[in-house]
Amino acid sequence: MFNYGNIQLKVCGITDQKSLEVIQKYSVSRVGLVSDYLYGPNTLSTKEIQELTIASYNLKLNPILLIGNIQMQEVISIVNDVAIKEVCISNQYKNEEIELLNNKTDAKISISVNYENFDYNFFEEILNNISSFYYDLIIYIKDTIEKKSLVE
């Protein structure tokens, strides 16, 4: 339906099966399921993520778990329990923790970055442990949402 060239779009903040079905009609294959450990709207419990992960795979969609603000051992446990194939972690973990996630799960790992936590040296260090970077124009802080444009 749409031709995005080499850009892979991801629709984030999915909270129900009906949204998955609509997304599938628009030829977008990547969907973001946001853990309630993160700040912001449209977050899901681990049980809800597990249910939507199964529904996503049934619809031939690629769900991505967005997670952070918890210890890496708990991230590993959730990734394995949910049986998700890709996880996007917040940019708070050290390279050793990312290596642990890489070694203890079968999931591809991506990392969320934004204009406030852009550290080129860190990105060079973790490059062998992740599959992609996601650049976020919205920063969720406990009770605040800060938005930027690409121009900014």
Question: What are the roles of these predicted feature ranges?
Answer:
Residues 4, 57-60, 105:
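Short helix-capping segments at alpha-helix termini
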Residues 10-12, 32-43, 62-71, 75-102, ...:
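Catalytic beta/alpha-barrel core
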Residues 43-53:
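Glycine-rich, positively charged N-terminal anion/phosphate-binding segment
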Residues 1-12:
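N-terminal amphipathic alpha-helix/helix-capping segment at the start of soluble metabolic enzymes
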Residues 24-27, 79-80:
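Non-catalytic positions within long, well-ordered alpha-helices that form the structural scaffold/packing
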Residues 11-17, 26:
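N-terminal beta1-alpha1 ligand-phosphate binding loop
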Residues 21, 54, 76-77:
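Alpha-helical segments flanking ligand/cofactor-binding loops in enzyme cores
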Residues 51-63:
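Short, structured active-site "lid" loops
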